[in-house]
Amino acid sequence: MHISKFKIMRKTMLIVLSVFISISSCKKDDPIYDINQIQSNSYNANKTKLKTPGQYISILYANLFQQALSANELVEITRCIESVGDKEIVHEVIISNFMNKEGVTIPSDSLMRADLNSFIEETYKRFYVRDITEAEREYFLNFFESHPNISSEMVYTAFSLSNEYQFY
């Protein structure tokens, strides 16, 4: 009798163990997606060289006035930049002076607000010489929507002072 109880108990344990193992081992496989590997670069990954003061001023003037800066003015402004230690402040002063000159080619604020998408695209091509990414577009559209007092002059100033604009 003792042996038969042992056999029954053993069979019961085997059945319980089998059921437990089969329940715990039957899992649905996680889906595996085929993803194409692509090489992703930063938007400004190829811009590694810092512009010289002469390059910065020439390009800035061309972007703002849509014409070349005279050699005399270029030398004078370049000397001004090189004579001051804090380049950021000098750049701000130069941009401010350029913005106050006649002949600056900046779209009016009403024109900017009328078609923000094309304004943003043209500004990126003009200053960064590249296309805008969708994330940047979305950011700027939201930014302009939440800041109605931003002018096109402020946008051009910000792009001219940005880190990406300092490199080529």
Ranges and model annotations:
Residues 22-25:
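C-terminal motif of bacterial Sec signal peptides marking the signal peptidase cleavage site
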Residues 27-168:
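Substrate/cofactor-recognition hotspot
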Residues 10-16:
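Sec-dependent signal peptide recognition
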Residues 1-9:
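N-terminal secretory signal peptides that target proteins for export/translocation
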